[in-house]
Amino acid sequence: MNFLSHYYFDRNRGNPYEVLGMVLPDLIKNADKSWNIHPEKNIHLFSEDENIKSLLFGWKRHLEVDKIFHNSSFFLYHQHQIKVSIKDSILGSPVKPFFLGHISLELLLDNLLLSENLIDVEVFYKLINEVDDQILKKFINLNQIEDTDRFFYFFDIFKKEKYLYNYSNTEKITYALRRICMRLWQNPFTEEQEYHLTKSLILYKTKLSGEFLHIFELIDLQLN
């Protein structure tokens, strides 16, 4: 799941460290895709400070949410249906429809949460801005990452630009997909492909809107 979908499960929690921990695995990977850390396997390292423990608590919830989501019939069905619906839109693109179907589904879920006013993005940004950088730095250092400047460079941009607001606009999802794909391919889509991809996703959002909440309810039951 993407940032806002993860936040959905902590939307009623007021602990900034738990909320940040819930999205931290993706932030770490976005800052440097070579970083592959597993704090959940070294719990004893994170027991001396309550805020550090809260970051770890959120981290573990993130992993559990993704595990439930990616093994659900909802995910398997809709990522396949999106793949089928967009494959003609991206003919000739180096991007595989399967890859795009997976990411598109996650971004559409974020979009629907915003469209239905089920989360408050401003509260999300407010909470993560309350996290003490020194505590976050210590958590990252405990995971054997020394180059925290690299992380905080990305994290500061993430907080400043607040690009998650853009997910409320379905047309901006294609832009987000392009940015993600550009990490792997220099020119993932032509302008014409982007146009047709956007139309396909807008159409699929209509199909998804009537049932997307079921997956959040399912995960919530298993998580809590």
PLM regions and their residue ranges:
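An N-terminal structural lobe/cap that precedes and organizes the functional/catalytic core
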Residues: 1-99, 195-224
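An amphipathic alpha-helical core segment
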Residues: 125-213
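Amphipathic alpha-helical interaction surfaces
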Residues: 66-70, 115-118, 183
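Short, hydrophobic/amphipathic alpha-helical patches that form generic packing surfaces
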Residues: 6, 22-30, 103-115, 175, ...
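Active-site-proximal alpha-helical scaffolds that flank and shape metal-associated catalytic sites
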Residues: 82-155
